[in-house]
């Protein structure tokens, strides 16, 4: 069964290799780039597929020797090892056959907002954002704050950042949803535990080709930027609000002194939000992704709890509990949270492909 699935991939890979050597393709940069990308995407699967087919052939050849007086025992011993190898290769190939998320290599817009819980929610927005920044640092990603709105106690009402690097979306796409925090606030004299919530959205950065907006569908308002406590931070109308009329999605931006820069930033985030809305619509077709809120704009569902008194982090989607919350938050090592989610998601996808 698996052999018949693998043959077309090998044939396509060999066809691409042949095409890349033709003058017709060599003289067409666009076509050459497309074929090189396709070849690169197939390479790991094809290498494993060839190894699998060779191992399968060796097993069959050895079986023909089972009755041989001199070589029979040796062939049986060798087949034990080959069958173990075949099983391992099959698992690796099944993972490689999972359709790749086309957004996995994209940069992302990270949007964190304070929800219920007042000042404490705002403080946790800052704490989680700092942890994500540390994670980005560990991964060699670059973080650029696009917009931030601070509250009066050193936290944030909202932070929007652009995170760039290899595989950013593939690792952070599982973070979208409501994150609940339980801890004793520094201002709490009675030592009571407060519960607050924040929402996280992960939106792939998109280009003009992926999201084409009709300018007639946009309502653009300009106004003066307001600082903390209502003081003016700018005497010109540099702040911008863009509303997409068909969906009602709007983005305000006032971090830059230039109206043009604010408009440019707002438009980029608007495109990302529209793309996210499209992903959410498609999500209903993919039950494995839906279970994990992957790429979902549904921020109402609680995905994770951070319980500081117990030093506990729980991801409710897969029943993961880790008693190393403070270490994760301080080091930014989210791999120990993300890896089990990725493994669970891959298992779900494999199950779906087998059904």
From Swiss-Prot:
What PTM annotation applies here? Methylated by PrmC. Methylation increases the termination efficiency of RF1.
PTM N5-methylglutamine: at which residues?
231
GO CC terms of this entry: cytoplasm
Chief location:
cytoplasm
Name one molecular function that GO assigns to this entry. Answer: translation release factor activity, codon specific
Q: Give the record's keywords alphabetically.
A: Cytoplasm, Methylation, Protein biosynthesis
Q: Which HAMAP family does UniProt cross-reference here?
A: Rel_fac_1 (MF_00093)
The protein here is known as Peptide chain release factor 1
Q: What is the lineage of its organism?
A: Bacteria, Pseudomonadati, Campylobacterota, Epsilonproteobacteria, Campylobacterales
């Amino acid at each position: 069964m698996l052999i018949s699935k693998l043959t077309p991939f090998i044939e396509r890979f060999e066809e691409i290799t042949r095409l890349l050597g033709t003058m017709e393709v060599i003289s067409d940069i666009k076509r050459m780039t497309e074929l090189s990308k396709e070849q690169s995407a197939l390479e790991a699967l094809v290498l494993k597929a060839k190894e699998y087919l060779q191992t399968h052939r060796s097993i069959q050849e050895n079986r023909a020797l089972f009755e041989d007086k001199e070589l029979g025992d040796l062939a049986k011993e060798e087949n034990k090892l080959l069958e173990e190898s075949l099983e391992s290769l099959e698992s690796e190939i099944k993972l490689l056959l999972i359709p790749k998320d086309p957004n996995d290599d994209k940069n992302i817009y990270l949007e964190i907002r304070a929800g219920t819980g007042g000042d404490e929610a705002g403080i946790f927005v800052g704490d989680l954002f700092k942890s994500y920044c540390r994670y980005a640092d560990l991964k060699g990603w670059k973080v650029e704050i696009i917009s931030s709105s601070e509250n009066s106690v050193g936290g944030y009402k909202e932070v929007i950042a652009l995170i760039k690097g290899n595989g950013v979306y593939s690792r952070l796409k599982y973070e979208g949803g409501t994150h609940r925090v339980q801890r004793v606030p520094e201002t709490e004299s009675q030592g009571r535990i407060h519960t607050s919530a924040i929402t996280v959205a992960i939106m792939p950065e998109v280009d003009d080709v992926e999201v084409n907006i009709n300018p007639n569908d946009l309502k653009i308002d300009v106004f003066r930027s307001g600082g903390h406590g209502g003081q003016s931070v700018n005497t010109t109308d540099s702040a911008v609000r863009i509303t997409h009329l068909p969906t009602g999605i709007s983005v305000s931006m006032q971090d830059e002194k230039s109206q043009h820069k604010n408009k440019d930033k707002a438009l980029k985030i608007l495109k990302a939000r529209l793309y996210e809305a499209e992903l959410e619509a498609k999500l209903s077709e993919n039950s494995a992704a839906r279970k994990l809120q992957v790429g979902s704009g549904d921020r109402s569902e609680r995905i994770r709890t951070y319980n500081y008194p117990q030093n506990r982090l729980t991801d409710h989607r897969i029943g993961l509990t880790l008693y190393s919350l403070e270490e994760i938050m301080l080091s930014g090592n989210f791999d120990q949270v993300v890896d089990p989610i990725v493994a669970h998601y891959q298992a779900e996808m494999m199950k779906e492909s087998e059904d």
